């Protein structure tokens, strides 16, 4: 896969950043926000966009709490009628969230000025409605999670391990809900329950308990008699003997001290 990076000395917004690469787009193209986890079928999304003869298409996902999302109103034909930004549920015009996944024709870039901060939701989409452009919403059953909070990040990890997301989990599947990476070492006395991923070259010591949904990244070292519940260890993290972790995220190469008890939050570095 070839990847082209576009560095912005000054941020240009969701639309301004795409406009900066306008000379790269000579056909239908897809924009996907990078802070979400999804298994949306891009092929089907683009086919829908073309069948509708649209200039722009937004992938929509129904949500329960609209106060966290921009919502989109559509008619029976899928045509977008209006937008509302993070309304209270009782005031929402719709429960269909803008996922930040878009399909455009190159002509849509004409609505974006060059070199200035410009946003799709706030600036471009209202113009498309005002001009009466063919602008539609795609509604299908796909997984989507806006990973904008620690709680959402943890939940997305759990959803992957429980099979709710159509993604490939690295490692060898051993029994129901357990994936083990290459050269990982797991002591025979370790207790593992729920959905657990143990990464490449990780070490799980004697008497360790991994309970609930737990992700152990590559090169992690969990020393004896540690208990970890519903937590994520990023690559290179280590946990001292007898420690207890629950509902937390342990950062890259972070060392949890022996006998330490931690509940909730994210551990990045010590003060």
Segment roles from a protein language model:
Residues 19, 38, 109-110, 211, ...:
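Nucleotide phosphate-binding site architecture
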Residues 58, 71, 101-103, 249:
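Conserved hydrophobic/aromatic beta-strand scaffold that supports enzyme active sites
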Residues 6, 61-62, 73, 77, ...:
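FAD-dependent flavoprotein oxygenase/oxidase catalytic domain
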Residues 29-30, 37, 43-50, 64-66, ...:
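Catalytic-core segments of class I nucleotidyltransferases/pyrophosphorylases
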Residues 2, 53, 77, 132-134, ...:
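A generic structural signal for alpha->beta connector loops
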Residues 16-20, 42-47, 88-89, 122-123, ...:
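A generic local structural motif
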Residues 1-76:
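Conserved beta-loop-beta/alpha segment of the NTase-like Rossmann-fold superfamily
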Residues 173-271:
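Structural signal for interior beta-strand "rungs" in well-ordered beta-sheet cores
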């Amino acid at each position: 896969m070839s990847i082209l990076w576009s560095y912005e000395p000054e941020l240009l917004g969701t639309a301004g950043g795409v406009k900066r690469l306008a000379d790269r787009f000579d056909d239908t193209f897809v924009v996907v926000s990078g802070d979400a986890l999804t298994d949306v079928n891009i092929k089907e999304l683009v086919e829908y966009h073309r069948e509708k003869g649209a200039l722009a298409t937004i992938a929509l996902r129904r949500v329960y709490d609209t106060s966290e999302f921009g919502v989109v109103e559509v008619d029976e034909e899928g045509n977008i009628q209006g937008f509302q930004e993070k309304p209270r549920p009782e005031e929402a015009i719709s429960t269909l969230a803008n996922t930040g996944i878009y399909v455009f024709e190159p002509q849509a870039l004409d609505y974006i000025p060059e070199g200035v901060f410009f946003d799709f939701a706030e600036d471009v989409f209202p113009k498309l409605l005002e001009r009466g452009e063919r602008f539609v919403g795609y509604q299908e059953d796909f997984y989507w999670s806006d990973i904008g909070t620690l709680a959402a990040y943890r939940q997305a990890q759990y959803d992957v391990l429980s099979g709710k997301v159509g993604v490939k989990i690295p490692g060898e599947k051993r029994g129901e809900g357990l994936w083990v990476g290459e050269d990982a070492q797991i002591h025979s006395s370790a207790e593992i329950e729920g959905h657990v991923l143990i990464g490449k070259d990780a070490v799980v010591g004697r008497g360790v308990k991994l309970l609930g949904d737990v992700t152990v990244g590559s090169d992690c070292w969990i020393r004896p008699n540690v208990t970890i519940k519903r937590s994520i260890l990023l690559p290179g993290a280590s946990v001292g003997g007898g420690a207890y972790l629950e509902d937390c995220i342990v950062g890259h190469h972070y060392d949890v001290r022996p006998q330490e008890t931690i509940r909730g939050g994210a551990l990045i570095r010590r003060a």
